[in-house]
From Swiss-Prot:
Domain ACT: 679-760, 788-861
Tree of life domain: Bacteria
Name of protein: Bifunctional uridylyltransferase/uridylyl-removing enzyme
UniProt GO BP: regulation of nitrogen utilization
Taxon lineage: Bacteria, Pseudomonadati, Pseudomonadota, Gammaproteobacteria, Legionellales
Region (Uridylyl-removing): 322-678
Amino acid sequence: MKNDNRIIKNTIKQFKEKLCKDFSQKANITSITRKLAVFIDTILIQLFIKNKLHFGDNFCLLALGSYGRRELQLHSDIDLLILHTEKVSNIQLQRAQKFIQDCWDVGLEVSHQITTVSSCANLASQDLSVISTIMDMFLLCGHGALMEELIYQTHTLHMWPSHQYFFAKLQEQQNRYAKYGETAYNLEPNIKNGPGGLRDLQILLSISKRHFKIKKLAEGIGYGFITDKEYEELKYCQNFLWRVRFALHMLAGKPEERLSFDYQVKLAQFFGYQDQSHILAIEQFMKDYFKVIKRNRELNEMLLQWFNETIVYHQKQKIIRLDDEFQLSNRFIEVRNNRVFKQNPQSILKLFYWLVKRPDIEGVRASTIRLIRESLFLMGKRFRESKETANIFINIFRTGNDPYDALQRMNRYGVLAHYLDCFATVTGQMQYDLFHAYTVDQHTLFVIRNISRFKKNEYAKQFPLCAKIISALEKPEILYLGALFHDIAKGRGGDHSELGAIEAQQFTQRHYMEAEDSKLIVWLVRYHLLMSQTAQRKDIYDPKTIEQFCQLLPHARYLDYLYLLTVADICGTNPTLWNAWKDSLLKELYHAAKTRLHKQQELLDEAALISIRKQYAMDILISDGISSRVIQDLWSQFKGKYFLHESPEVIARHTKAILNSKQFPVVIIMPHHSQGGTEVFIYMPHKDERFTITTSVLSNHHVTIQEAAIITCDNQFDLDTYIILDENNQAFLNEQRARDIQKSLCDHLANTGRLPAVSRRRLSRALTHFNVKTQINFIDDNTNHQTQLFLVTNDRPGLLATISRVFLTLNIHLHNAKIATAGERVEDMFYISNQTGYSLNHEEKTILKEKLILEISKSKY
């Protein structure tokens, strides 16, 4: 018996290998999935007969789910139902269990149920998944009357009438969408369960089976709910997804459903995609994938809406006239006749204007969605150059209401891509990195959604400054259009901000926009990264930084638009990207620039600013009973840079801690004054290796450094400030953890022995799939006798500790650091000098660059 099972197992293996070979040679995927199902039939029937279950009328073996539909993928589960009569003996039931064991022994991934017809029907009446799989059952072997009885007992006359089944399946889909983030455009999408995936096809078949009692979706053409063209589109989507899924199973050697980064690369290679000058093979493959997902979801939405109207709202319609062309039917917008778009193509856009103007409209009637899709060819050159068309499109953004849902529908139905050629090029465009979580088109729409959220009361607490600014914004449509175009040139090669500004300029001219409005939109697109780059890469406490930033703003009102776009952009790039620290940096930059622009104050010299901050801090300390002479004696040792970088409140807090301390080092861990991060303040006798020690200790405690200010005072004491975040990129809330870090820093900084070892931690799975080439550039700052070192490399645990060790080895002094991580990519700015306190010369730069590249390459673990 064991030998028989081994032979069968080997036969299955050989058959699957043959199928994989055929598939690799472009065999038809529908034929392959059916061949596999039929082959598995023969194995199961053979095992069923071997266990003597085919005699008499006691047992029936049924295939369920995708296996029942004859759509078996390479490593899909084989769903089986064994029905038996009430009179079976224990010996016969043991044979049924032995049959299942034989299935497992030959390597079949079988999920099964052994039950009676009545028990199965009872379970189906309570469980949506059971009734759904039963509807796909296929008789393999045994007494067919048992299956017929189950079909009768689970008929809509007895359970799950079509309207109840429809609502349950609709809720199931909504729950599934919520689980996968409401979008199909995630970095590592699930081909089976994600929005737009294979489940979106299966729900259409299940509901149509339940309502129309059909066996195949093609039969639905006769009922009028699907056209020949739509059916062909669904078949195309299905075949594409089946091919990808079969290849995914083949490459993974298991039932893998997620297109993880490593499999995306392999799939692109398998399907013959090749890298091009400005777009990777993987990005081309995923763009095709996302386009199919988008089309699949679009058809899913339209046909479910049709079911909703047919199954649920088949009663008398409540009609409300909107204008000569549109009306509401049970709160869904529809055309008043099927000639509307042909007679006036501009009405295609007008429909979406109504959706924005009337937020009470719940959606679009399925018949009208179908008409939109069939009328896209009308949106040609003449349509796009029409002034009426331009006015309607701009008015979508001028209603004062949220345009996100309407724009999302315009994207799903293909209207945006037909109206804006440049939008068509970014539809489905992904970027192969961890920073951008969505395709460019979906990210763009999320940015617009975020802008709309700033207006809503439920988001005012999360974005109070944004809510305040947008409430007074003169022309919100400018902000929306800036958002629509800010990434429009992604994937072309070159500077997407500059290329996008050209597209925006052409758009504003074609849409007859006022010169000042056009100028602002184009400027927003060109400079949409300015604020985030300034806040995260430069010293925003330096008045020169604020002055340089403000010089790029043609008018004070530009700042409001740029701030709102920046926050919306960051929040729409990746759900994990926005945090309190970024929030605080942008707010501080905004307020500093606002003061400079609105008060038109003269740029104060450093001495004046230092004097002002000292006086405020002095007042705080004197009110606490500390002598001004003691304060001045201490401050006389501090560099002016310290007073520029810190607020008066923080200066007072640091001063008080130092004066009250009886031993060194002084280590204070406290919330940063902006509450966006946690501050680590260190004051101690000068020690060259203190930056290396500090970065190593913080790395071992799994915290990340966002900023570092390193100062050696005139009395040869070090005065250093770090801003740190926890693993979730948030400020510390755990006081015990802060105390542990404080103690560890004190112990190691006081120790004159060896440097603390940096604990080795594995890279996350996602990080291992990306390789950012280490790039190092130098810029000399002759005013401050410093060199700016800009470093780009792969993120990894302990990176800053590695860099600090190189600095220590080469006697490089760090003065300031700005740390920025974008997914797998680190972009760090270090302000350094040589051991004599001057900018690095050419030889020193060369040695430092070579050493950094070497040590960073060795630290990738």
